[in-house]
Structure formats: structure tokens, C-alpha cells
Amino acid sequence: IRSGPAGYCRPSPRRSNSSDLCRYPPQQHGYTPEMSSTTIPTLALNNGVHIPAIGFGVYQTPPEQTVDAVVTALQTGYRHIDTAAVYGNEREVGEAIRRSGVSRDEVFIETKTWITDYGYDAALHAFDKSAGKLGVDQIDLLILHQALPGEFHLTVAAYNALEKLYADGKVRAIGVSNFMPAHLRRLLAETATPPAVNQIEVHPYFRQSELLVFDSSHGILNQAWSPIGGITFYRDGAHNSTLENPVIADIAAEHGKTPAQVMLRWHLQQGRQVIPKSVTPARIAENFGVFDFELTTDQLTAIDGLDTGIRGGPEPEDVTREKFGVPIPEA
């Protein structure tokens, strides 16, 4: 985790593809003294842009709850908001940022292009739709949501569109989500700009070690969605919740932390960016309290050992436009 020097750097102009940003300082709006002094470590992407080590996700957050949840997250100290076109709440994310009192320059916005909008021209227009709903001219990180392996020519064309948006300064970084090594090898061979991130399912019950190594060896930052294993609660009846796992619970007790905080810390110490989600203010604050303790090597290894190899989300190979091709509304 990169924490930078004392203090924090002033963000570069939003249209720059480079960044001298070291720190995302919380604003003073509605903070306790403890939170107002917190500064978020950042991780360097392969193009020099920095991303906060922890983000706030809004997957499956209903639009009517999104504004309050995102405002709460920003007032807690989060400075990265992760949304997606298919979530149906980009507009509410933008509204929350405007209501929060936090400057746009201090918020790292990430969104995802859905498979219905793959292809070169469609992906260019998808940016316009997302930017319009978010109410911004520039998106910090734009990624392809799925590999769509059965029509990978459309995936490559969509990524070419992201490269164009990046070259034009409309996005500060580009990447992918749910790509496996075979998908990444082909993408790297057929495009010019390596993805800055690969947002994937990673949690103690599903670590994806081979993919983590592949991404790291190619300078691709791993972002963990479902970082505390929430996706497993309804997919795998053979295991108890990660929040109830005795190994994790014992480690949490040793540090005076919660199981969720221990799992997030496990990701951070292994170099992954994490995107927890919640609509509950207490949980939002709990998930942010992960920068004041450190797990031992033995504790990290013990959590690694919980891997079941069982995926909670859909298999990337099974994602097709026939099954998942919902239309994305205009801005």
C-alpha cells in the first residue's frame, strides 16, 4: 500500500492522463475528529494514476438508496466510488457526489461498460451515456464489465474504444473486469494499452491465485469485488459465511477488529484494491476502519488456506449477450 509522504498532493487537472495525486484527504463535512484525520493510502496504476486503496461499491444498491449510501461513504472518508452502467444507479452516484460537499477533484469515479454496448461505436456511446448520468466530463476509470468470450471480437473493439477515450483524455485509466488469463492474453495481443485493473471476485473462499499472479506479472492491479465473500452467502451451502468462519473470527478477536475488517486488511496487505459495499452507515464506517492494524504473515497464510476454489458469481465463460444482454438506457 502506498501512503505517500506526509500531507497530500494536490490533484492534477481532471483532463490529464497523468497524476501527481498521492492522497485523498477526507473533507471536514460531518466528520468525527478520528475520521477527519484519516488519509487514504493509494495504489499506483500502470499509467501513473493513483487509486485509493479502498473504494465504495454500489452493486445491487437500489437507486432510491444510492444517494444516501454514497453521501455517507464520502462523509466517512471514502474517495473512490465504483458503479456500472448495468447497476442502474450511475445518475444517483453523480447526484450523491454533488450533494456530499466533497470536491469532484477528490473523488475517483469508476464505472463499467456493459456487454450490450460492446463494439467500437457502441462503446464510445456508452461512455456518453455513463458520463451524462454521472454528470461529469471525465471518468477516472472506465472498464469492460465482462470478457464476453463467445464474441470476443466485440470485446476487442470495445476496448479499442476505451483506448480512444483514454487518448482523448475523456478517461484517466482503462481496464477490465472478470477477465481470466486466456482472455487477458488475447486482449494484450490485440490491443496497445494494457489494462490498468482487472476487477474480479476475490475473497477468502475464492482466491483465484493463478489469476492474481498473472495480473501482477503484467502490471495489472487486482480489484476485489465481493471482498468479504458476500456472494457466497447464497451460492455455497456447504460452507458457513466468511463472517462466521472461526479462523477469521479468531484473528479478528486478536486485533479487536471485526471479521469484515480482517478480510479487507488481508486484501490490502496482499496488494489488492478492495470495493466493499453497504447501505448501513455503521457498516460503511466499519469497512473503512482498516488502516490502523496489521496482520501477521501467519495470519495472512491462514486466511489463504480457506480457499475452496468455488466461485460465487457467474463463470466468465458463461456470460453471453443472449443470457445477460439487458439494454442500457440513454442518459
Give residue spans per PLM region.
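CE4/NodB-like, metal-dependent polysaccharide N-deacetylase domain
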Residues: 123-144, 164-168, 190
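Beta/alpha (TIM)-barrel catalytic core signal, keyed to glycine-rich beta->alpha loops juxtaposed to Asp/Glu
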Residues: 147-331
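Compositionally biased, low-complexity flexible segments
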Residues: 5-6, 10-17
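A short, structured active-site edge motif that brings together acidic residues
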Residues: 104-118, 140-147, 202
